[in-house]
Amino acid sequence: MREDLRPFWVKQLYVSFRAAWIHWFIRPRCVHLGVHAAIMSPWYVDISGPNISIGHSFTAINTVSQRVHIGVWGRGVGEGRIMLGNACLMSPGSRISASDEIVLGDGCMLANGAYITDSDWHGLYNRIDRDDASTPVRLGDNVWVGDHATVLKGVTIGDNSVVAARSVVTKNVPANVVVAGNPA
């Protein structure tokens, strides 16, 4: 690992600026943002929509080209909800998009490019009108969603389960298992 050669006061200034950015720009976008949120480069986080609740000790890692996206686009005003438990981690490029409800338990990890959605967003032939068929997604405690894996609508993943890289989860996953493939 590379040694940090910045003077201490520069590092403290950066940490203070990052904390202020979280306080003034990230926290107002959430219904609840727990304490000890560690958001690396918080100016690259996209949080949009109502009813987003993030637990304590949330960590998000962002880059210029791979932003973290958390978004609610409910069918009506004030509809849709995302709830992240305590100690959740979102890696660069990970996305959570809710139309109805997405709930992540405590200690969940989303690897680089992971995608969780609870809706198809539009029909196959009629792409103008929105598809209203959305069903909630629930991830239990300590679930790890691998690199570029996708979790689709209506899926429940049990505690301590792992979704392998590039997998597409279309059905429920029991607790304490590893799933892989397309579909997983």
Task: List each language-model region with its residue ranges.
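Domain-scale signature associated with acetyltransferase and cell-envelope carbohydrate enzymes
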Residues: M1-T117, G140-D141, D159, A175, ...
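Glycine-rich hexapeptide-repeat left-handed beta-helix
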Residues: L13, L104-D106, L110-A184
